[in-house]
Amino acid sequence: MAMPESGEVADERRGTATADPAVAVERSEADGGFKGGGQQQRSRFEAGSMPGMFGEKGEPSLLGASEPGAGISWEKGEQLRRYAVGLMSGTSVDGIDAAAVEIIGVPGGDGGVSVRLLAFENKPYPADVRREIFELFDPARATVDRVGAMNVRLGRLYADAALSVIGKAGLSPADVSVVGSHGQTIYHAPEAGFTVQIGEGAVIAARTGIPCVSDFRPADLAVGGQGAPLVPFTEYLLYREPDRTLLLQNIGGIGNVTVIPAGCGPEDVYAFDTGPGNMLIDGVASLVTGGALAMDAGGALAARGSANETLLGELRQDAYYALPVPKSTGRERFGADYLERIVRRGRELGLSDADLAATVTRLTAWSIGDAYDRFIAARYAADLMIVGGGGSYNPVLMRDLAAEMAARGVTVATQEAVGGSSDAKEAIAFALLADYAMARQPANLPAATGAARPAVLGRSRTEHSTRLGLQARQALLERGYSRVRAQ
């Protein structure tokens, strides 16, 4: 069982701890985090060097293009353009990530689509909401009345987040074609064929006046998939390259990797959960401090300790790591009970709080390297691992991960180093998935989820049945009509 991809809060993770200078991790200078290990290394991320990630003139432009190097610009003729909002809340339950984007092109069309991020915000959950969501992770406490009430309350919070980011982008709700809301996962049971995300889409549609697509995962489960991961579909659209094999590693509550082979088609892309991400790191910080810390911000606690090889050796024996792909995991496996066992064993070994934090941080990095050895290296020799999610702001974790992957000949970079956004990446993905849903285009990757066939994802709710659908707007555009706003 798994709690799928997480949209992590990163602001508090912009590290105060000092990383080992011997291990370089790429992060853009403007981000204020990791910088490259010399000019030769940095040259791989100069403007224009990531096809599809930068415009033809070298300036950062569209975040991705369906065809490598084919960034769509304002001057290249009339294209179908629209605005969408993506909402994401992940397994760390920190809050709501909201992204407003511009999408250009036709979903499923020969020309593909590209996406430009207009605005991003994170709206932290109120303390009582976060506390109750954690209680709902326990099936015995997730009674129908409690789940129903939180479903509506989250719908209101998501709607408010959507309206806020729309305003930040300089748009009005009337400009936006669709809101894509992942919702908050409270239970995910792929072996039983079901998943539960809450945050009512009908409430979002009613409060914003914008069509809303939500409940993305059940359609994949219904055709035999895991219902996760879903983000690899959008990663394929936005990141693939003709000559380099990329690994897109997200480190949210759970870690997950997408393998994008050089020159691949959608059938070649696969993805899976690598194991715990920030879940154990933050869990240890909270447990050993009696809740005084909600997370190990900046890896500060782990930086004061040393990883214990005895405990690491025991933790590496968990059966999940050897399970075949596709696979997914989550709090049901690496949650509170597992965490308490780790802390008890650590105390038996005489470990300090900092040593415990350092050990589970090293475990997360090891699990990513181990997954590469078991499930990727024999098929593809990766050139670059691009890391996103809240874990990318933990310098101790990134130091450990860079060391793991350097031993395997793989360079590690952050989303910011290649022109992306660690914070916004998954919210962007659900905006694009909603756009595909409105066009009734499949948006899962069977090779990633294990589904028997492609499926149209999500359920749509709308307050305005007269609002033009994507296909109708494209038909009008082809007949000479244009709703493209003047810039």
Regions picked out by a protein language model, each given a short descriptive name:
Residues 80-116, 247-262:
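Gly/Thr-rich phosphate-binding beta-strand-loop-beta motif of the actin/hexokinase/Hsp70
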Residues 81-83, 190-195, 202, 210-293, ...:
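Phosphate-binding/catalytic loop of phosphoryl-transfer enzymes
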Residues 93, 358, 362, 413-466, ...:
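Glycine-rich phosphate-binding/hydrolytic loop that grips phosphoryl groups
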Residues 95-125, 264-365, 369, 453-486:
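Conserved ATP-utilizing enzyme core subdomain
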Residues 102-165:
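Glycine-rich nucleotide/cofactor/substrate-binding loop typically near the N-terminus or early
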Residues 140-199:
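Short beta-strand-loop/turn "lid" adjacent to the catalytic site in phosphate-handling enzymes
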Residues 157-165, 353-381:
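Phosphate/ATP-binding catalytic cores across multiple sugar-kinase/actin-like superfamilies
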Residues 186, 382-404:
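Glycine-rich phosphate-binding loops at beta-strand->alpha-helix junctions
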